From Swiss-Prot:
Transmembrane segments: none annotated. This is Putative phosphoenolpyruvate synthase regulatory protein. It comes from Herminiimonas arsenicoxydans. The keyword Amino-acid biosynthesis does not apply. One of its GO terms (molecular function) is ADP binding.
């Protein structure tokens, strides 16, 4: 009997990224730290916590997660206002305050007070970059999971792969960090039966990049969402992954496995492919 079949999978640790702005700074730092650990995390972003009411609401969500999980949530915070940070610190989570950890010691070292403008732009170049990122985020959200075929010509990359192979988080990471307009489309059994890519993608095949994943890991992830379903069954996961990889090879699509890769590593590979493509244009 397989020992892996009997081994219980530890529940994902809940992580909150809290900010009185977009939360991108807290999330970026948090991701960099969390990727050092070979564990699963349930990540929740709470942006624009800029009033006491919102801070107390965040406090309730953190404490609810503690009661539900039976373990302390981890909190990455860039709350600038002390009164808001004080409320969140009363939670039952482990609090990682980026302001207190980094900004306050630098204030002492430099002998000046910070402007307390985490995430704000200081130059016209920064403003343009911020605008590009927001546009990319909106594009990625509008084109998540095959929601829309509109304006695909604007996409920098189109990710394809079976459901839960990492397309959505990769798309959003590319948008938030690099201003990359990334659409993503699931490859589903109907596509395998037709032996064709989802409708509307053939015209943009040069923009497509595929993500695959080991079937056993895919089954684990899907069972967290729909335990005991055909969708999450290992046999079905093997079928979908095999068919998706066959399709990508048949269509000449570049692809990689996301099984052991962090979002940062996947994104770096895609960025390299995009830059290489632009150099050859």
């Amino acid at each position: 009997m397989s020992t892996s079949a009997n081994r219980s999978t530890p529940s994902a640790r809940t992580v909150f990224f809290i900010s009185d702005g977009t939360g991108i700074t807290a999330e970026t730092f948090g991701h960099s730290v969390l990727t050092q650990f070979d564990l699963r995390f349930k990540q929740i972003r709470l942006p624009f916590i800029d009033t006491l009411d919102k801070a107390h609401d965040a406090l309730r969500k953190i404490n609810d997660a503690y009661e539900l999980d039976g373990q302390r949530p981890i909190i990455f915070s860039t709350l600038v206002k002390a009164n808001l940070s004080k409320v969140v610190r009363q939670s039952k989570g482990m609090h990682m305050d980026l302001i207190q950890t980094f900004v306050e010691p630098l204030e002492q070292e430099l002998g000046v007070k910070s402007t307390h403008t985490i995430g704000r732009s200081h130059t016209s170049t920064d403003s343009e970059e911020y605008k590009n990122r927001i546009e990319a985020i909106n594009f990625s959200l509008a084109h998540d999971d095959g929601q829309s075929n509109k304006n695909l010509a604007e996409a920098d990359v189109i990710l394809v792969g079976v459901s839960r192979s990492g397309k959505t988080p990769t798309s959003l990471f590319l948008a938030m960090q690099y201003g990359i307009k990334a659409a993503n489309y699931p490859l589903i059994p109907d596509d395998f039966a037709r032996e064709k890519l989802p409708g509307g993608l053939l015209e943009y095949k040069s923009k497509i990049f595929g993500l695959s994943i080991a079937p056993d890991r895919l089954a684990e992830i899907r069972n967290e969402r729909l335990p005991g379903s055909k969708y999450a069954a290992l046999a079905n996961c093997r079928y979908e992954v095999n068919e998706a990889e066959k399709m990508m090879r048949r269509e000449g699509i570049r692809w990689m496995s996301s099984t052991t890769k962090s979002i940062e590593e996947i994104s770096a590979t895609i960025l390299q492919e995009i830059k290489s493509e632009h150099r050859t244009d």
